[in-house]
Amino acid sequence: MELLTNFPLLSSLAAIIFAQVIKVPIQFIVSRKLDWSLVTSTGGMPSSHSAAVTALSTGVALEHGLDSSLFAVSAIFAVITMFDATGVRRHAGEQATVINKLVIDFNRFVNEAKDFPKAAEKEKQKKLKELLGHQPIEVFFGGLTGILLTLVLAYFFM
C-alpha cells in the first residue's frame, strides 16, 4: 500500500479535486449561475491541469530536493503541460467557438431559404466543445493552487 503514502501523487490528486470543485463557486461569483457541470469539465478558473502538475513538482521537490532528477522531470512535465494549456488547447477552443458560430449562421441561412425543402426530422448537430484550454491567468492560478495546496498538505502530513 505504498501508493497510499505517495505524497506527490496524493497532493496532485488533491489539487485536481480542489481545483475542479472550486470552479463552481468562482463561476457563481462571476455569473450568479450555479453550474455543477464545471466539476467534470475542462477549462475554466483555475486550471486543474496546472494545479496537478505544480502539486506534483512541489511534492517531488519536498521529498527528493530541487537537485534531484525526479524534480527535473516533474518540473519539465509541468512546464510542457502548462504551455500546452495556454497554447494548443486554448487555440483549439477558440477555433471551436468560431466553427460553432459558423454552424449557427449556416443553419439560419438554410432555414430562411425560400425553396429549401423541409426535412421530416432535423438532424441534431453536435456542438464542438469550446472550453478546452486556459487563459494564462487561469494557468497561473492553477499552478499557484497546486503549490500552495501541496505546502499546506506537507505541513500536516509530512
Curated annotation (Swiss-Prot):
It is a multi-pass membrane protein. The keyword Heme does not apply. Keywords: Cell membrane, Membrane, Transmembrane, Transmembrane helix. The chain crosses the membrane at residues 10-30, 137-157. It comes from the Bacteria. It is found in: Cell membrane. The keyword Cell membrane applies. GO terms for cellular component: plasma membrane. This is Uncharacterized membrane protein YuiD. It comes from Bacillus subtilis (strain 168).
